[in-house]
Each structure stands twice: as structure tokens, then as C-alpha cells.
């Protein structure tokens, strides 16, 4: 047996369809809807939302997961594999995924195109620049930062308190040395000195706005609502106030159009927006879903991290804006992650898996499956049926898969073993059939007056504090919530400012249901600690901060960037 091909080698060996042909398979017209960026990528004009509105709606499927290990459990690969699998059973699918950030691609996480024989291609394009959307977000964000400092320099007519300015600068590189900086040093003509810093572009509120805007007009309005700080009277100061929103909208005019690509098997893939999964929604764009929902029998999208994170935000933030209701959700699980949730193993990013983790041990899988059960419950809290996808690895044992199936059955979820990484769509046919049956069964039950109907976890009228406590108790399993004095003051201020009807997006670790990354499984008897509360008014949510949140990552001792290069023919090498 030869050495296994890398993701890049597999992707490079694919025979790709012209992007116009991919568009035609979705009902998109080349001359009206597609703006090609080379042979295999195109922007999709937003007029497609209206043009396709009379077509039947696809079944809407969310791909989520158990609480992941630092290695990730294969949500994107499963999303791609599932999209491909539907064609094997005579159905059409479109997938919608987030756009990759280059910071993690050159760091330790790896790419965002899937893996093995379930990838979106060309994968180098997806992971490196694509059509330049992240650069546009970076430019728009920094344009506003420049306008703020320019306003201070030219007399500060709005009376902005410099220490209150929360709008930092961004770049799409992991660079810890820029987390905290002082700007405006030098001569008086070099600006007003103040402390600031850089975040990674994916953490920008502009990226969250790009993901949640439902039209170009909505994008412009949301940009204007961004709060950058407050004045001497304590009133919020917006991007509109400093007259920066118009220029930002112009910079983002093309970036709001979703990118069309394809999988290795020719399934259409809408790739758009990439907001952080910790402090923002962690979902691809609303406009991509509004287009995709009219282009196939099934639209499959994914949400970042576990169901307590990305899925909760998908249901309570993204779906409120799009008006779309999911028909089913997938919870991706792996044997290695469930063993880790037993609390008996430690998995570290960049380090080899512990040898004992690979030994047959269904008891440890069952011990860790409490996390799986809780994440299935988190899906069902919203009236959505769940199907478990066991993302199989060669080191798994049949008894361990059986243990996962038993745990899923206990909470009323179907289960499917998936081998889409090695087999492509064929390896996820069992999952596609399980979803088809689950959706049909739920619809039959609904017609009889039973079955699940999609519902939000809380009404927008609920006070912010109560929304936080509802998510903490119902989704995370917390006993209660403890607030720092600063967090309580911020909540009161947001209610007074008229932001109380916004949904909440709790910023916490993705490595645990709790706010402590060391607590595995489904911990009980703990309290969520909220140390600070911030507002993304433009994006349209309040985000309480629980624990330490890094918005600018650093590079590891040996980042992926060390291995990435060009060969003698100008081809990228070392990229996954």
C-alpha cells in the first residue's frame, strides 16, 4: 500500500466542473447571477434571492457537533460528505459553509475546506484569499478605526471619551505581539496617543455583520449602528456619528455576495463569511442560505464548535434574521472525543494522540457520551430532530461505535457511521438516508398534531439578564450565573440605551459545556461566571464574556507556516 495522499494532493487531482455548470445545476443564470473569479469560483449576485423565490424550498439541515477536542471532530468534512451523499440517493443538495481565515491556516488549526475525499475545491483558493472578502472586511474595519482617530485629532466635536473607544484594528494574521499597543506616538501631528490593539479579522464586528446582513441595504444600516464608544455624557457614539459607515459599505459592496465553489463530486458549495465561533455566531452568511434554500432538495449548513455554541446561535440569532426554519440537525461525534469527555485522557493540539486513547474501550466512550446526550438535548430544546453522525477513524473499534449508538438511542436519536473522509459521498449515504427518514417522520407526526416544531429558546422581550440565565441553565447545564459588578453595570446600561431586545451570544470556551475548558463531559453543579458584557449593536447581539477570551491568536512553536511553500513549478506545497 502506498502512502496516503494529503488533502492538497487529493484536491489537486480532482476534475472540476466549470463554475457556470455548477451554477446552472442550481438554477442560476450565468449572465444574471454569476460573476466568475477564474474558472472555478464565482460571486453570486443577491438578485438571485428574489429571482429564485418562487422555486420550492429545500429541506434545511444544520451540521453541529459534540463539544470538540482541540483537533476538531470533522463538521466541515461531514457537511461536504453529506452534501455529496444525497446525489448517491437521487437527491440534489447545496452546502453552505464559512470562509477560511488565513490566520489559523498558517497557525495550527488547518484549513476550512473539509478533508480527504469530502472537500470543497479548489482548496488552496478557499484557504488563501478566495475572492478577497476577508481583506474587504479588514479594510472596512480599519477604515472606521482611522475615522475615529481622525475625529479625535481634528477637535473631537462629538466629545468622544478616548478611554471608552472599544473599536480596535484588525488583521488576518495570528500575531500576539499586537494584542496591546499604544497608537499616536511621535509628534503632535501623528495623532492622539491612546492604548489600543489588534484583533484577528474573524473577530471583527464587521465580519459578524457580513454574516447576518440580509441585503446590501441591511448591511449599510447595520454598519451605521456599530457602537465605537461613548461621549462625555455617557451616550453611545456610532459609526454613523463619525461618518464612517458609508465608506465601509462601499468597501464591502462586493464582499456581501456569496462565493460559489464545488465539492470534489461537483456538489454546489456556497462559501461566505467567517465570524468567530467564540464571540460571534460562528455561522456562514444569511444571504448564502437565502439563495441556497431555493437551489436544491436539501440545503446543508454548519455551525461552529459544539451544539451549545454555534447551533444555539444559529437557532436564536441567525434563524431570527433569515426567517428560515431547520428541518433537522446532525450532531457529529468521534470515538476519540467521547473518550476524552470521560475525563481519563488529554488531547493537545499539535501533539500525537495518547496511545491508550486508541485502545478498544467502549466503557470510556459511554462515560463520555453524557456530552453527546446533552448536545442532542440542546438541539431538541429548539424543536429540531437530531441525527448522530459517527465520524469514523481507522483506529475505531466496532464496540465503540455500538456504544455511541446505544447512547444516542437513549435520547431518541438515530445514528449513522460515516466514512466520507476516505470514501466521499458514498461513505455518508447511511447518514443521508437517516436524515431523509427523520425529516419525513417528523413531518408525519406534525400533521397528526405531534412531532417537533422549531422554536426559539427565549423571546426578545425577555430582559438581557434572564436571556443569559436561560442559556446558561438550559443549554450549558449551569446551576446559575454569577456576575462581576462591571458586567451588571453594563447590562443595566444596555437596557437603558434600548438594546435590551437584542439576542445574546455568550462568549466562552468551546472546549467544555462550562466556562472552564478543563471540565469535560456534561458537568453539573457549577455556575457560569460573567466577568464583562459587550454589545455588537451593528451585528445585533449582546455578548457576555465568560472566562478568558483571546480575540488575537498567537502562533505555536512550530506553526503550519513553516511547512508551506511553493515548489519549482509555482504550486503550493505543505498546505494540509
UniProtKB/Swiss-Prot annotation:
GO terms for molecular function: ATP binding; formate-tetrahydrofolate ligase activity. The keyword Translocase does not apply. Pathway: One-carbon metabolism; tetrahydrofolate interconversion. ATP binds at residues 69-76. InterPro entries: Formate_THF_ligase, Formate_THF_ligase_CS, P-loop_NTPase. It catalyses: (6S)-5,6,7,8-tetrahydrofolate + formate + ATP = (6R)-10-formyltetrahydrofolate + ADP + phosphate. Keywords: ATP-binding, Ligase, Nucleotide-binding, One-carbon metabolism. Its EC number is 6.3.4.3. It is an enzyme of class 6 (ligase). Belongs to the formate--tetrahydrofolate ligase family. This is Formate--tetrahydrofolate ligase 1. The gene is fhs1.
Amino acid at each position: 500500500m502506498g502512502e496516503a495522499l494529503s488533502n492538497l494532493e487529493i484536491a489537486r487531482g480532482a476534475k472540476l466542473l466549470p463554475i457556470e455548470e455548477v451554477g446552472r445545476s442550481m438554477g442560476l443564470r450565468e449572465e444574471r447571477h454569476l460573476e466568475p473569479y477564474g474558472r472555478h469560483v464565482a460571486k453570486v449576485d443577491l438578485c438571485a434571492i428574489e429571482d429564485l423565490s418562487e422555486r420550492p424550498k429545500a429541506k434545511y439541515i444544520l451540521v453541529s457537533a459534540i463539544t470538540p477536542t482541540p483537533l476538531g471532530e470533522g463538521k466541515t468534512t461531514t457537511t461536504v460528505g453529506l452534501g455529496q451523499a444525497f446525489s448517491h440517493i437521487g437527491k440534489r443538495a447545496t452546502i453552505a459553509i464559512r470562509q477560511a481565515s488565513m490566520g489559523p491556516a498558517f497557525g495550527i488549526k488547518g484549513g476550512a475546506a473539509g478533508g480527504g475525499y469530502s472537500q470543497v475545491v479548489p482548496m488552496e483558493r478557499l484557504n488563501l484569499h478566495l475572492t478577497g472578502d476577508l481583506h474587504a472586511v479588514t479594510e472596512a474595519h480599519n477604515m472606521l478605526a482611522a475615522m475615529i482617530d481622525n475625529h479625535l485629532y481634528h477637535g473631537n466635536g462629538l466629545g468622544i471619551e478616548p478611554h471608552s473607544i472599544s473599536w480596535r484594528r484588525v488583521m488576518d494574521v495570528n500575531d500576539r505581539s499586537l494584542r496591546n499597543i499604544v497608537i499616536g506616538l511621535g509628534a503632535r501631528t501623528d495623532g492622539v496617543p491612546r492604548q489600543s490593539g489588534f484583533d484577528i479579522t474573524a473577530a471583527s464586528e464587521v465580519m459578524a455583520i457580513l454574516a447576518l446582513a440580509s441585503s446590501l441595504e441591511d448591511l449599510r444600516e447595520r454598519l451605521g449602528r456599530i457602537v465605537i464608544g461613548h461621549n462625555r455624557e455617557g451616550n453611545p457614539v456610532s459609526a454613523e456619528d463619525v461618518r464612517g459607515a458609508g465608506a465601509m459599505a462601499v468597501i464591502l459592496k462586493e464582499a456581501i455576495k456569496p462565493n460559489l465553489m464545488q465539492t470534489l463530486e461537483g456538489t454546489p458549495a456556497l462559501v461566505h463569511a467567517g465570524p468567530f465561533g467564540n464571540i460571534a455566531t460562528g455561522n456562514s452568511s444569511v444571504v448564502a442560505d437565502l439563495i441556497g434554500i431555493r437551489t436544491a432538495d436539501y440545503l446543508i449548513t454548519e455551525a461552529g464548535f459544539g451544539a451549545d455554541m454555534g447551533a444555539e446561535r444559529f437557532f436564536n440569532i441567525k434563524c431570527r434574521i433569515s426567517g428560515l426554519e431547520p428541518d433537522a440537525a446532525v450532531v457529529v461525534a468521534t470515538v476519540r472525543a467521547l473518550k476524552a469527555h470521560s475525563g481519563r485522557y488529554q488531547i493537545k493540539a499539535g501533539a500525537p494522540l495518547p496511545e491508550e486513547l486508541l485502545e478498544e474501550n467502549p466503557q470510556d466512550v459511554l462515560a463520555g457520551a453524557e456530552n453527546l446526550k446533552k448536545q442532542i438535548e440542546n438541539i431538541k430544546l429548539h424543536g429540531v430532530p437530531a441525527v448522530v453522525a459517527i465520524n469514523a477513524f481507522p483506529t475505531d473499534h466496532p464496540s465503540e461505535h455500538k456504544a455511541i449508538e446505544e447512547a444516542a438511542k437513549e435520547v431518541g436519536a438515530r445514528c449513522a457511521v460515516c466514512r466520507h473522509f476516505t470514501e466521499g459521498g458514498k461513505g455518508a449515504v447511511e447518514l443521508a438516508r437517516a436524515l431523509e427518514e427523520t425529516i419525513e417522520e417528523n413531518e408525519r407526526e406534525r400533521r397528526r398534531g405531534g412531532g417537533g416544531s422549531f422554536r426559539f429558546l427565549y423571546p426578545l422581550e425577555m430582559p438581557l439578564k434572564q436571556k443569559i440565565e436561560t442559556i446558561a441553565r438550559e443549554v450549558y447545564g449551569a446551576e446559575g450565573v454569577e456576575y462581576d459588578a462591571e458586567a451588571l453595570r453594563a447590562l443595566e446600561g444596555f437596557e437603558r440605551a434600548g438594546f435590551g431586545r437584542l439576542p445574546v451570544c455568550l462568549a466562552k470556551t468551546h472546549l467544555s459545556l462550562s466556562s472552564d475548558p478543563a471540565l469535560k463531559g456534561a458537568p453539573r453543579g457549577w455556575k457560569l461566571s460573567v466577568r464583562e458584557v459587550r454589545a455588537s449593536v451593528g451585528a445585533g447581539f449582546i455578548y457576555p464574556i465568560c472566562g478568558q477570551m483571546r480575540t488575537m491568536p498567537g502562533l505555536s512553536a512550530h506553526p503550519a507556516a513553516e511547512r508551506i511553500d511553493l515548489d519549482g513549478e509555482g504550486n503550493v506545497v505543505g498546505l494540509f
